């Protein structure tokens, strides 16, 4: 695997391999790269979980993390992302994890030798989040085949939803959507069925809630926090309708008492904190796959 840019670029076999490697890391597997392996985390949008867990993953693998601050870089002088990455490549950085506000920012960057991991591109995709979600689901159920999974909330503006709806259908899950119709595109019906939140809670195995992404909305919000929670959120009463073995997920950050009642965030059915923990292990697996391929290519070039 040279880069990780989208879930669609991964085969089912590659996905299964990454999930298995993440499971091995969680069980205590060790993998250390030499001290001349470098990573840079380039985040042009705010991030807590993705940024932190990638850095922890890098350090657990023995990878040196190169500091980068967009606000103090030459990009403020007009340097392009391509030329910035060309610089990173020239000084010996092996892999760049990039979070960017523009969808498909990575177009044209694939020809560089430095590996690129998409840490989220606008409303486009978030492949490492999708993989950690898959890892969390597989840990719980052991399979995706036949699982009923609901994606509920601000779907149109969610890169997580874009990644997950495509891959979950490919892996054999049955998908449902819920949330405001204003934030739902009819094209999503190619992947699943739209139902009200009251209809989905009693039938799904996995309820995947999405944050209301105020920063990507134009104009005045159509819902107050209270009205959104009442109409579309997972209230305490709705949670009582969930199946006994159903789980609750959320990519975070969570708007408590908006998408989900505050009391449910750390409840028995919630896997929200587990997702954060699993993020380190899946990102270790991603980095290991990329860096091992780089090592193999380097060895071939010496013959």
Curated annotation (Swiss-Prot):
Catalytic reaction equation(s): carbamoyl phosphate + L-aspartate = N-carbamoyl-L-aspartate + phosphate + H(+)
Binding residues annotated for L-aspartate, in chain numbering: 77, 159, 211
The EC number(s) this enzyme carries: 2.1.3.2
Keyword Transferase tagged: yes
GO CC terms, sorted: cytosol
MF (Gene Ontology): amino acid binding; aspartate carbamoyltransferase activity
Residues at which carbamoyl phosphate binds: 49-50, 99, 126, 129, 252-253
Pfam families in the record: OTCace, OTCace_N
Superkingdom, natural source: Bacteria
InterPro entries: Asp/Orn_carbamoyltranf_P-bd (IPR006132), Asp/Orn_carbamoylTrfase (IPR006130), Asp/Orn_carbamoylTrfase_sf (IPR036901), Asp_carbamoyltransf (IPR002082), Asp_carbamoyltransf_Asp/Orn-bd (IPR006131)
Keywords: Pyrimidine biosynthesis, Transferase
Complex and partners: Heterododecamer (2C3:3R2) of six catalytic PyrB chains organized as two trimers (C3), and six regulatory PyrI chains organized as three dimers (R2).
NCBIfam families per record: asp_carb_tr, PRK00856.1
UniProt function note: Catalyzes the condensation of carbamoyl phosphate and aspartate to form carbamoyl aspartate and inorganic phosphate, the committed step in the de novo pyrimidine nucleotide biosynthesis pathway.
Protein name: Aspartate carbamoyltransferase catalytic subunit
Organism: Listeria monocytogenes serotype 4b (strain CLIP80459)
Organism ancestry: Bacteria, Bacillati, Bacillota, Bacilli, Bacillales
Gene that this sequence comes from: pyrB
